[in-house]
Amino acid sequence: MAKEDVIEMQGTVLDTLPNTMFRVELENGHVVTAHISGKMRKNYIRILTGDKVTVEMTPYDLSKGRIVFRAR
């Protein structure tokens, strides 16, 4: 997938699911299921309920995403 095809949105973590999956509410009100990106997993960045995150989504499936950044 080319980097230009990615949609980046801000959101808030609502719930923690098994296998490092999270339910994230985006700024526009949609709720998506997201997993942690590889670099965040490698650097042991913890994500908790209520954290503000940046989610990357592909235009082909807008119900799933990848968490690429956790705001402080």
Curated annotation (Swiss-Prot):
GO terms for molecular function: ribosome binding; rRNA binding; translation initiation factor activity. GO terms for cellular component: cytosol. InterPro entries: NA-bd_OB-fold, RNA-binding_domain_S1_IF1, S1_domain, TIF_IF1. Signal peptide: none annotated. SMART domains: S1. Residues 1-72 form the S1-like domain. It is found in: Cytoplasm. Keywords: Cytoplasm, Initiation factor, Protein biosynthesis, RNA-binding, rRNA-binding. Transmembrane segments: none annotated. Component of the 30S ribosomal translation pre-initiation complex which assembles on the 30S ribosome in the order IF-2 and IF-3, IF-1 and N-formylmethionyl-tRNA(fMet); mRNA recruitment can occur at any time during PIC assembly. One of the essential components for the initiation of protein synthesis. Stabilizes the binding of IF-2 and IF-3 on the 30S subunit to which N-formylmethionyl-tRNA(fMet) subsequently binds. Helps modulate mRNA selection, yielding the 30S pre-initiation complex (PIC). Upon addition of the 50S ribosomal subunit IF-1, IF-2 and IF-3 are released leaving the mature 70S translation initiation complex. Belongs to the IF-1 family. This is Translation initiation factor IF-1. The lineage of its organism: Bacteria, Pseudomonadati, Pseudomonadota, Gammaproteobacteria, Vibrionales. The gene is infA.
